Amino acid sequence: MENIRNFSIIAHINHGKSTLSDRLIQICGNISNREMSNQILDTMDLERERGITIKAQSVRLNYKAKNKKNYQLNLIDTPGHADFSYEVSRSLSACEGALLIIDSSQGIEAQTIANFYCAIEMKIKIIPVLNKIDLPNSDPDKISKEIESMMGIKSKEIIKCSAKTGYGVYEILENIVCNLTPPIGNINKPLQALIIDSWFDNYLGIIVLIRIKNGNLKNGEKIIVMSTKKVYSIAQMGFFSPNKTKTDILKCGEVGWIACSIKEIKGAPVGDTITLASYPSEKMLPGFKKIFPKVFASIFPTISEKYQSLKNGLIKLSLNDSSLFYEYENSDSLGMGFRCGFLGLLHMDIVKERLEREYQIELIITEPTVIYEILKKDNTKIHVKSPSKIPNKKYINELREPIVNCKILSPKKYLGKIISLCVEKRGIQNNLIYLENKVIIIYIIPMSEIILDFFDKLQSISNGYASLDYKFKCFNKTDSVVIQTYINKKLIDSLTKVINKNYINLYSKKTIENLKKIIPRQQFDIVIHIKINNKIISKGIVKQVRKNVLEKCYGGDVSRKKKLLKKQKIGKKRMKKIGNFFLPQDSLFSILNIKKNKK
């Protein structure tokens, strides 16, 4: 174990994390120049196209240091986007150290700070790295001072590098060897292996990524997943180099994968402990906090016949993504689909795009909402994932919405505009921290205000220089209300929303205006009602189309005309009573703010 080093690379999105991983792999000779490609650890097409890391990946590197000793370096690459911050904490739990990468042209950003404190809380040794020093607009000295004032890291400890050209990468490798401690563990103790991640393989079933904390694990041995007490026999095991490489043993301190015919992802819960059936451990390792979805949206196929394909796609995606939640939903207006839970808007976008690409399904995805906590009259609490499922007010004591602690890092000159935006979004100021050229703005804001257009507006008013990080804080009582839309006395469930009292008039007025534009006129009036607690707060009418029944009456007796008009009047009454209007789905999408993306 003396020559093993386990480390992660953590950074804000687009600070050069994957490029540095590529360079480390190339220098350690794990892959030939012919096989080398950009973002080699980003195996999904989506990761390469978007230039982001979505799933944490691991690779074993062999490095001969200046002291002539050979070292095994286990690198776990991590995502940079805030939506996937849970992957960062999971990766760090398998490591003794981390490279904190900061772009020398952009400086410290919100997610940089979040990752830094996450590593500090987990007592991870940090090696600070200033990347992209080859860029013309990089300012290493200025950013070094920024790091020193914000994080307390001395400038002389910061390594300057360019992952693109390879400058400074050898210095990083030497720092990993010299400054990170080897793993702590006992080879003679009962096996304790932490499950870092798990995913589905078409041939091997569930593959489990583990870090051996104590003991050794050999191929063919029987293991116990400690939370379920289920016993499995190891069929294959190995490590990534970055290609999947088989081995017969994983030793104390190492990171590797095992395949043991586990059929579903629940069979190997992330954060669980694996031990030997023949020599079991009595204690489980400390796991991870359970991840709960933050954002919910409904997904429907545009063609109802594709429902089964959508169901199969979600089942398979959830095998590789334990944070994806879904349940069956049937909407009167949109048909059969699923209510899905995501970690954030990027996570939602990734899932949608993977479903469309990998399963050839054209999808409709509704406007995202948050989960609400309800304190009922009998003092029981329930959590509701969809506004249409919120009970009637007479059964509710309190409606509570999720509140987030929102940190914004921005140049000082945009402070006024950002504060105005936060106030507009019902934010309460918690703190302002002034730095040399920047300011950290901390606000408590309802999550429902964050998940729609907050980030886009923030980028717009700061010319793209502000960065955002937010974490769930608690559920707070809200004065928001459930608004329902009825068309000809029929509830349109997909138009049920939770709206803050300040926006009720604006929302109801806009909804009626938009519906009047898109509902096709019939031979009877179509009445639109906006209701709160069954009380009508706004009304609109799509006027009927008048059919000229006298068109063929060229003159003649007036009584004949009166008879035809009376007959028409009776017919219209009957049509209004039993007639169904047709509301085109495309029209409904525009009202719902729904994203409908074609392939």
UniProtKB/Swiss-Prot annotation:
Subcellular localization: Cell membrane
Known catalytic reactions: GTP + H2O = GDP + phosphate + H(+)
Annotated positions binding GTP: N14, H15, G16, K17, S18, T19, N131, K132, I133, D134
Cellular compartments per GO CC: plasma membrane
Membrane-topology descriptor: Peripheral membrane protein
Domain of life: Bacteria
Record flagged with keyword Disulfide bond: no
GO terms for MF: GTP binding; GTPase activity; guanosine tetraphosphate binding; ribosome binding; translation elongation factor activity
Gene Ontology BP terms: positive regulation of translation
PROSITE patterns documented for this protein: G_TR_1, G_TR_2
Residue span(s) of domain tr-type G: 2-184
Homology family: Belongs to the TRAFAC class translation factor GTPase superfamily. Classic translation factor GTPase family. LepA subfamily.
Summary of the function given for this chain in its UniProt record: Required for accurate and efficient protein synthesis under certain stress conditions. May act as a fidelity factor of the translation reaction, by catalyzing a one-codon backward translocation of tRNAs on improperly translocated ribosomes. Back-translocation proceeds from a post-translocation (POST) complex to a pre-translocation (PRE) complex, thus giving elongation factor G a second chance to translocate the tRNAs correctly. Binds to ribosomes in a GTP-dependent manner.
Cited HAMAP family: LepA
Protein name: Elongation factor 4
